[in-house]
Amino acid sequence: MKVHVRKNDTVVVISGKDKGKTGEVLRVIPKTGKVVVKGVNLVKKHQKPNRQNMQGGIIEMEAAINSSKVMLFCEKCKKATRISHKLLEDGAKVRVCKKCGETF
């Protein structure tokens, strides 16, 4: 499944319980079309004690959300935006903001 965002992109959640939150993409899972965003869709995981973590306990971590629920955030126009692709003269393919024309 094609995913329109990449790792380290800043995105805005456009639907669901975390609607309106902004965060950085930590991981992209193209096989399932999901992304993990920092500070979004937090779940509690019950961790058993092991050699690395002797204490164990309940930890809070980010769970994956569908990539269709996030939109790329443009730093120039300070809004969530759709993107288009543009070929530069040197043959490089870049992503462009549809609202202001800024390249990502």
From Swiss-Prot:
PROSITE patterns: RIBOSOMAL_L24. It comes from Clostridium perfringens (strain 13 / Type A). The keyword rRNA-binding applies. One of two assembly initiator proteins, it binds directly to the 5'-end of the 23S rRNA, where it nucleates assembly of the 50S subunit. GO terms for molecular function: rRNA binding; structural constituent of ribosome. Part of the 50S ribosomal subunit. GO terms for biological process: translation. NCBIfam families: rplX_bact (TIGR01079). GO terms for cellular component: ribonucleoprotein complex; ribosome. Belongs to the universal ribosomal protein uL24 family. It comes from the Bacteria. This is Large ribosomal subunit protein uL24. Keywords: Ribonucleoprotein, Ribosomal protein, RNA-binding, rRNA-binding. InterPro entries: KOW (IPR005824), Rib_uL2_dom2 (IPR014722), Ribosomal_uL24 (IPR003256), Ribosomal_uL24_CS (IPR005825), Ribosomal_uL24_KOW (IPR041988), Translation_prot_SH3-like_sf (IPR008991).
